[in-house]
């Protein structure tokens, strides 16, 4: 799956425009389209907009929590930003996210400068699980996540 992200994110970053295109791209890259993927896309698009970055213009440092069910958020962020392991712009940290966070992602401009720290709280997981359980359609999942507030926190990265 990670190899697919490396290959596809280089060529298709930010080319998806509709919920249908995002869901199709996410499913093709990740192998499915649960609610974690569109949350990653939402974070990636938010960071790209706030940091005024184009495709492949950001670096990501991803802190996973082994208590979270998966690190699928990383695939969504990679899809939205064009970051990849192969380009050395996506790194999964050896250290873990704190216990109260499913993931922490530090996103910075590739050329340097101030970045952003995104935290996905463990408290968001039941909401994401409910979206997956209640909505079988990937496009409906995408739209539900994009409309939802409070699924992540964002602050300036130190």
Please state what every model-predicted region is:
Residues 1-10:
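Bacterial N-terminal signal peptides
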Residues 16-33, 42-158:
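Non-transmembrane, aqueous-exposed alpha-helical and coiled segments at domain scale
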């Amino acid at each position: 799956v990670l190899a697919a992200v490396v290959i596809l994110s280089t060529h298709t970053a930010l080319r998806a425009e509709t919920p249908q295109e995002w869901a199709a791209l996410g499913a093709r890259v990740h192998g499915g389209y649960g609610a974690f993927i569109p949350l990653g896309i939402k974070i990636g698009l938010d960071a790209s907009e706030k940091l005024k970055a184009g495709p492949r213009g950001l670096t990501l440092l991803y802190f996973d929590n082994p208590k979270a069910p998966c690190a699928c958020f990383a695939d969504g962020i990679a899809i939205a930003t064009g970051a990849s392991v192969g380009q050395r712009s996506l790194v999964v940290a050896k250290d873990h996210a704190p216990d109260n966070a499913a993931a922490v992602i530090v996103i910075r401009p590739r050329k340097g400068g101030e970045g952003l720290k995104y935290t996905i709280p463990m408290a968001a997981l039941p909401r994401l699980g409910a979206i997956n359980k209640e909505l079988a359609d990937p496009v409906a999942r995408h739209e539900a996540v994009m409309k939802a507030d409070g699924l992540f926190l964002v602050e300036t990265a130190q």
